[in-house]
């Protein structure tokens, strides 16, 4: 089963593949999937 792993600066990997083209991504609570967020939201969260 794939798992979402959060990297720095709003990047995630999903089973070894970058989510959301590697940017603007957060993992769900249990790391079961990744959610793509627009860059503006990421900047608002201080993750961009």
UniProtKB/Swiss-Prot annotation:
Q: Where in the cell is it found?
A: Secreted
**Out of the domains of life, which is the source?**
Eukaryota
> What GO MF annotations does this protein's record show?
calcium channel inhibitor activity; toxin activity
Q: Report, as the record phrases it, the tissue specificity of this protein.
A: Expressed by the venom gland.
> Could you state one GO cellular component term attached to this entry?
host cell presynaptic membrane
Q: Which InterPro entries match?
A: Spidertoxin
User: Which keywords are on file for this protein?
Assistant: Calcium channel impairing toxin, Disulfide bond, Ion channel impairing toxin, Knottin, Neurotoxin, Presynaptic neurotoxin, Secreted, Toxin, Voltage-gated calcium channel impairing toxin
Give the intrachain disulfide bonds: 4-20, 12-25, 19-36, 27-34
Which family does this protein fall into? Belongs to the neurotoxin 02 (plectoxin) family. 03 (omega-agtx) subfamily.
Its biological function?
Omega-agatoxins inhibit neuronal voltage-gated calcium channels. This toxin acts by modifying the gating of the high voltage activated P-type Cav2.1/CACNA1A channel. Is a potent blocker in both insect and mammalian central neurons.
Task: Quote the record's domain comment.
Answer: The presence of a 'disulfide through disulfide knot' structurally defines this protein as a knottin.
Share any extra remarks: This toxin is a diagnostic ligand for P-type channels Ca2.1/CACNA1A in the mammalian brain.
Return the protein name.
Answer: Omega-agatoxin-Aa4a
């Amino acid at each position: 089963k794939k798992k979402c792993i959060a990297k720095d600066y709003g990047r995630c990997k999903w089973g070894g593949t970058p989510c959301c083209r590697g940017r603007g991504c957060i993992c769900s609570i249990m790391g079961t999937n990744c959610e793509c967020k627009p860059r503006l939201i990421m900047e608002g969260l201080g993750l961009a």
